[in-house]
Amino acid sequence: MEAFEISDFKEHAKKKSMWAGALNKVTISGLMGVFTEDEDLMALPIHRDHCPALLKIFDEIIVNATDHERACHSKTKKVTYIKISFDKGVFSCENDGPGIPIAKHEQASLIAKRDVYVPEVASCHFLAGTNINKAKDCIKGGTNGVGLKLAMVHSQWAILTTADGAQKYVQHINQRLDIIEPPTITPSREMFTRIELMPVYQELGYAEPLSETEQADLSAWIYLRACQCAAYVGKGTTIYYNDKPCRTGSVMALAKMYTLLSAPNSTIHTATIKADAKPYSLHPLQVAAVVSPKFKKFEHVSVINGVNCVKGEHVTFLKKTINEMVVKKFQQTIKDKNRKTTLRDSCSNIFIVIVGSIPGIEWTGQRKDELSIAENVFKTHYSIPSSFLTSMTKSIVDILLQSISKKDNHKQVDVDKYTRARNAGGKRAQDCMLLAAEGDSALSLLRTGLTLGKSNPSGPSFDFCGMISLGGVIMNACKKVTNITTDSGETIMVRNEQLTNNKVLQGIVQVLGLDFNCHYKTQEERAKLRYGCIVACVDQDLDGCGKILGLLLAYFHLFWPQLIIHGFVKRLLTPLIRVYEKGKTVPVEFYYEQEFDAWAKKQTSLANHTVKYYKGLAAHDTHEVKSMFKHFDNMVYTFTLDDSAKELFHIYFGGESELRKRELCTGVVPLTETQTQSIHSVRRIPCSLHLQVDTKAYKLDAIERQIPNFLDGMTRARRKILAGGVKCFASNNRERKVFQFGGYVADHMFYHHGDMSLNTSIIKAAQYYPGSSHLYPVFIGIGSFGSRHLGGKDAGSPRYISVQLASEFIKTMFPAEDSWLLPYVFEDGQRAEPEYYVPVLPLAIMEYGANPSEGWKYTTWARQLEDILALVRAYVDKNNPKHELLHYAIKHKITILPLRPSNYNFKGHLKRFGQYYYSYGTYVISEQRNIITITELPLRVPTVAYIESIKKSSNRMTFIEEIIDYSSSETIEILVKLKPNSLNRIMEEFKCTEEQDSIENFLRLRNCLHSHLNFVKPKGGIIEFNTYYEILYAWLPYRRELYQKRLMREHAVLKLRIIMETAIVRYINESAELNLSHYEDEKEASRILSEHGFPPLNQTLIISPEFASIEELNQKALQGCYTYILSLQARELLIAAKTRRVEKIKKMQARLDKVEQLLQESPFPGASVWLEEIDAVEKAIIKGRNTQWKFH
């Protein structure tokens, strides 16, 4: 009776595993097998979707029968048969052996107030069952003791019959348990149990009565389960279906049933898997593995504890073990020791059947057919026989080796955006070339060139040229392979799924007819390719040459280096620059900028020349394309593989970031004129040269786009935006839409990386909210620019929001006088943005930032403005009491004065433990309401991201009932409602430490302000700083030097202007005597002026020196003419005009004297100017903060 004790329903119902499958129909996959009937094979297909709850009804009763068979296995009276039948919708399951005890159940009778017997309790009462509480060594398939009850609930009628050797018990249950008729009990010596029932088909989505198809489908499914049970119970018990014995009394027979039709003549390997410790050792598993090339993916049938198990750790364990063995065996089997072979899923040709019992498992999933147990149980206790693994592995490897076959070079290939050469793959295949275009626009150019026809009969055409698109990007294959080295030193290269499925690279493989298992060392091997070479046709920019072409070369070097050695990989080198001289139609063409620079230096002037850049293939017009394709062969350059190339490929495209970082710490060494001449003379490009110049330039450019320069704290994009903003808003600072301003920047600053990226950068430059990257925005945002809630990701569309330049801040932080002294980036031969700014204050340590690039991490936490001002002023002002102390600290590279993290706009706390600072959010506890109110989050933690991180933490959510966010963009108010009696438990589980209290630990209200101070250097490459002081110390000399340069330049300009104005005043005084109007031409007048000692001057340079250096001013300003005098108009000779010039000279002289004083001041020239500009910046920042950076 104890086995049928009635339990508490509430506790029972809490178990998720007790609930049945879904009532709606779903696709039941994998339910197909075959069986032998009079020596014929018959298929059992499933034609339609079925209701899991209905299948569960049948399954629960079948599992009950197999559980009973296992329970009686060691008893005197065993179960010798299980009879399952299904006819006209009526399901029946009968087994012999001890029946259900026929005795009155006192507890149930008392509750029901009538006589209730144990069979009724077992089949009709949800609060009782033998499987509710199971021991750890239990191998029953039943889970919660409710399976039979659920079957009764979903049945129109059911008949329960059981005999215990003394009595026979028959009871009718109707109307889904609504009517339980009194049982009929009669004397009997029989021992058996039978369940018959008719499910409520109509309510489960079936016809009533069942249609022929439904009857056939359900019969097939039940028969399969009967066959599975036959394999599970073994030979001692016979399983009948519709009175015919099932012939699958072993795991081998069950495996044959599933695979004979789909994979005849396949090899079947069987084994017994034993465990080394109880209770697992008492129940070995039977395994059969069917290996066949017919199978295209791993499949399994698993009957554990009588349940048809669709998933489980036992399958994972077996699959992993097989995979390891196959990989090892495959490596040992390949004869060619240098062959690079790829392996896909090593289990894709296996169908595995597992039958047996596993103690102590749990059943999960909606249908309770997913086995759950710790995977280490199998690793620790179970061992698979080596003979089984060896024989099966050999079969699998044989199939894998057979699948490595040569590709048919003459077959048609179906690849997107591919046009086949007419002779490709034929007798003249080696005369064909595949043109690999960077993108669609390049394809268009190639098509134009290849279809010139009669106008270029000797040029390339589709007869011998095919073309394919690279799609604008190529995957880095070097990072998508795993090299496996065997004990014998053999290397096997395994491509991952991403690389295997990459359409672009697989398209190239198919089009060329490449074989991953061929080296192409011999001409015979290369002759089997569909083309004689591949020609990369990419843009002449960094993305095209440095990235896409580099990745294509790396792909061939990785798998087929011999093809590069034998000249198979080439490139189309198109003109980068064309110079059109006035009056001439044939331009001078240059393929490298170094060639153009060398040529330009030899020219006296480029005034009569038009210089046009062609970085994109699409820039060439039809006429230029025709001209190029007339000399097509001369533009095709072959790559060569030199000794150093292998290492460089590994550095730039491999997975070892430390090697790449060391290489990228230095800038690119440009090609010399000699190198370019050598390349043109032989039309060959060493791979190492391409990698050291083009690929390295691309990598460094990528770094500069992602990591800021330490001098200005800006990436290249932000620098372009600032330079564009200064230029765009110079005359009128009216607001402009973000997308309009983005178009201006792209046009005037030559931004080539897409509108979306540029607009995002503009929006970020104007964002100003607690936690935003920029504490000092260079633009004023008008509209919704994002909030703290989503970390700025909720900004409005660039079409609807506008920006203005934060001119008051920009003018003081970036003085206009500096702009003439900075080095500039030249794009397409035109001046764009500065290579770097050197602001009045070290902006690099004044703002937040985080970004990875090429193995480096860049993370900065803004420092306190007051500390920065104090340090810079102490450096500049010799009268500052800390001046000498700071210079001592800089000299000896030590830290003395504080440089703390900024707490501006942050209401939390900053604390230092050891070498790191930590930021802490704040909270208030209301014990009465059982609520914790978070009033501030750690620095730079967006609200939504924070709440999501808490919700994902299961050990925290066990204490939390609800999280409600009432935060605004400026303030934090997050209510964390706790479950009853949780506060004390939180204090116990989340310990209080010196660094954080229990609530801070529990709510994750602390983050570490750990920094990665990696910045771009002024001349390219990366510099790694250890402290913020080092950044400041490195920046100070650059800013200091700028003042000296500025003053020296101003001094030179003032002197030249004074000379010019003095000469003009002298001429006005002597004009009557000179009387130049009497001379016939300018040449004669100039001679007279020269004889009278007037200096020839370059008036244009003196009036508008702009970007001229001091050296240029001193050299060219005095090498001019007398236009500054001869162009004077009559009114400029009047006494009033002369008086104004004399006053102007006096002012310039006074300023010159002041500049000379500033050049002589200590501690360095321009120190007082720097102090004044620091004061101006401070005032602008205070005003900006007080006005939310609106400045009004």
Curated annotation (Swiss-Prot):
SMART domains: TOP2c, TOP4c
Key words, A-Z: ATP-binding, DNA-binding, Early protein, Host cytoplasm, Isomerase, Magnesium, Metal-binding, Nucleotide-binding, Topoisomerase
Domain called Topo IIA-type catalytic: residue spans: 707-1174
GO molecular function, one term: DNA binding
Pfam families named in the record: DNA_topoisoIV, TOPRIM_C
Record: residues binding Mg(2+) 1: 438, 539
Free-text remark on how the cofactor is bound: Binds two Mg(2+) per subunit. The magnesium ions form salt bridges with both the protein and the DNA. Can also accept other divalent metal cations, such as Mn(2+) or Ca(2+).
Protein name as annotated: DNA topoisomerase 2
Provenance organism: African swine fever virus (isolate Tick/South Africa/Pretoriuskop Pr4/1996) (ASFV)
